[in-house]
Regions:
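Substrate-binding cleft and catalytic face of glycoside hydrolase catalytic domains
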Residues: 72-266
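N-terminal carbohydrate-binding accessory modules
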Residues: 22-75, 208
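Aromatic/acidic polysaccharide-binding cleft in carbohydrate-active enzymes
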Residues: 296-367
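Conserved residues at the C-terminal ends of beta-strands
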Residues: 50, 80, 182, 250, ...
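Bacterial N-terminal signal peptides
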Residues: 4-15
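Sec/Tat signal peptide C-region and signal peptidase I cleavage site
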Residues: 18-20
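Short, acidic/polar
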Residues: 34, 55-69, 228-237, 314-324
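Glycoside hydrolase catalytic-domain groove-lining segments
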Residues: 64, 254-307, 323, 332-341
Length: 367
């Protein structure tokens, strides 16, 4: 059963009256089969997030990906840390000259493509030898979140990375990928100062370098948490004539109203994601580039706190259906975070059903 069919079935079951309840008398239902239809693209199953890049080499990761692919016609997977030192992309020799190694990158992306999905490339994080400082994020895998010490070397890395992908997979293939610059630079995933201006500098270098490799490569940002920085980002790329092929940002039902909307308004948890999407959609429409697609590259349903593990329950299906209904027409892609619980932001998963983000629990158990 496809995801869309499953959602429809869930809605139909939910709409059935409880046995014994007062039911209205049956009556005719008229449907105008000649009425003008409206397209309903499956924006919610085009992309999924996952645990960080290196985990894509695991057999359990790939098996879970294949299982989800059977029921959801998703085309892209997005994950953090393709430039983490554990992937081995960047080093420097004794003279300080860059040394590149794309062996693990090839194995990671080959594994996705062999299973019928493409990378939604998140360009992160900073290789230690390229970092201005050794600022690390508190995730278990301790990624470096500082700016580069030398933008010439950063540009060289991005150019070599993109050129290698084009050489290996061909421009007709890689032109169908997306390249998103960094992850949530407005919070503790980026320690540049001033925070926004320094991120824009990183974005400008990265976007222009990608386009120098081939103008068909698609790049975007600002990849922020809580739907932030979109208007300043759009103003910046327009004013400075920086390439941007899409807008990306994140928003979760568990994000606070203050963070999402900068207001004290009382907004229910189950309305926050699509209200935030509507806000960003309007910001794009008001910008100098109103036709840019909106990629919501992280979201999930309310967790209701760690003690309830709501994301391990059948509640998720109904919550997803409600979000799809609310968000229709406002967004091009929503990338659910994540497709499975092969995921180690807080350490190695000890047991299934521990409240993880994924649709498949540890051990390949379908939620």
């Amino acid at each position: 059963m496809r995801a869309g069919e499953a959602i429809l079935a869930a809605l139909l079951v939910a709409s059935c009256p409880v046995a014994g309840a007062n039911q209205p008398a049956p009556g005719p239902v008229e449907i105008d089969a000649h009425a003008e239809g409206t397209a309903f693209p499956h924006f919610w199953e085009q992309a999924f997030g996952s645990g960080r890049a290196i985990l894509a080499l695991r057999a359990s990761y790939r098996e879970d990906l294949r299982e989800l692919k059977k029921v959801a016609d998703f085309r892209y997977v997005r994950f953090h840390a393709i430039l983490h030192d554990e992937v081995g992309v960047y080093d420097e020799d004794s003279h300080g000259s860059p040394v590149y190694n794309f062996s693990y990158v090839d194995q990671i992306y080959d594994g996705l493509l062999e299973n019928g999905v493409r990378p939604f490339v998140e360009i992160s994080f900073m290789p230690k030898k390229l970092a201005a400082r050794q600022d690390v994020h508190p995730f278990w895998y301790r990624q470096v979140v500082a700016p580069p010490k030398d933008y010439a070397k950063w540009d060289g890395l991005i150019h070599a990375f993109a050129a290698h992908l084009v050489e290996r997979y061909g421009i007709d293939e890689v032109a169908q990928w997306y390249f998103e610059v960094w992850n949530e630079p407005n919070i503790d995933f980026w320690t540049g100062e001033p925070k926004q201006a320094s991120y824009f500098e990183l974005y400008d270098h990265t976007a222009r370098t990608l386009k120098a490799v081939n103008p068909r490569l698609r790049v975007g940002g600002p990849a922020t948490a809580a739907a932030d920085w979109v208007s300043p980002f759009l103003a910046h790329v327009a004013q400075e004539d920086v390439p941007a092929d899409f807008v990306s940002t994140h928003g979760y039902a568990d994000d606070t109203v203050q963070n999402l909307f900068h207001t004290a308004e009382d907004i229910p948890l189950d309305e926050r994601v699509c209200r935030a999407i509507g806000k960003v959609h309007a910001e794009i429409q008001r910008s100098a580039r109103p036709a840019l697609p909106l990629m919501w590259t992280e979201w999930n349903v309310p967790s209701f706190g760690e003690r309830y593990h709501a994301r391990d329950t059948t509640y998720v299906g109904a919550a997803l259906a409600e979000d799809i209904y609310q968000c229709d027409g406002l967004v091009d892609v929503m990338s659910y975070w994540t497709f499975d619980d092969v995921f180690e932001e807080n350490g190695v998963v000890r047991e299934p059903f521990s409240g993880g983000f994924g649709t498949i629990a540890a051990g390949g158990i379908k939620k």
